[in-house]
């Protein structure tokens, strides 16, 4: 599963870990992306989305129907 939110587009951040002796190694900070199922009443079916915690708040605020419309307007297949 990729670590990209389908609602917000949030993806991993990259940087360096710095040890006590200042050796630097590459690392990445993954967003909290979960695979969640949502019911679409207009279509009478459930869809599965990869959603970050901020994406869940957006769905709670705007509603699943409008969020799915925006995702489809971007050209993503659901």
Swiss-Prot record:
Residues 1-28 are annotated as: Disordered. SUPFAM superfamilies: L28p-like (SSF143800). The keyword Ribonucleoprotein applies. The keyword Ribonucleoprotein applies. Transmembrane segments: none annotated. InterPro entries: Ribosomal_bL28, Ribosomal_bL28/bL31-like_sf, Ribosomal_bL28_bact-type, Ribosomal_bL28_sf. Keywords: Ribonucleoprotein, Ribosomal protein. GO terms for cellular component: ribonucleoprotein complex; ribosome. Gene3D superfamilies: Ribosomal protein L28/L24. It holds the Pfam family Ribosomal_L28. GO terms for biological process: translation. GO terms for molecular function: structural constituent of ribosome. Belongs to the bacterial ribosomal protein bL28 family. This is Large ribosomal subunit protein bL28.
């Amino acid at each position: 599963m990729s670590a990209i939110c389908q609602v917000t587009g949030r993806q991993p951040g990259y940087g360096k870990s710095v040890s006590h002796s200042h050796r630097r190694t590459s690392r990445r900070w993954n967003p909290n992306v979960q695979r969640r199922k949502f019911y679409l009443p207009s279509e009478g079916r459930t869809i599965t989305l990869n959603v970050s915690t901020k994406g869940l708040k957006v769905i709670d605020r705007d509603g699943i129907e409008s969020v799915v419309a925006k995702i489809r307007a971007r050209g993503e297949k659901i």
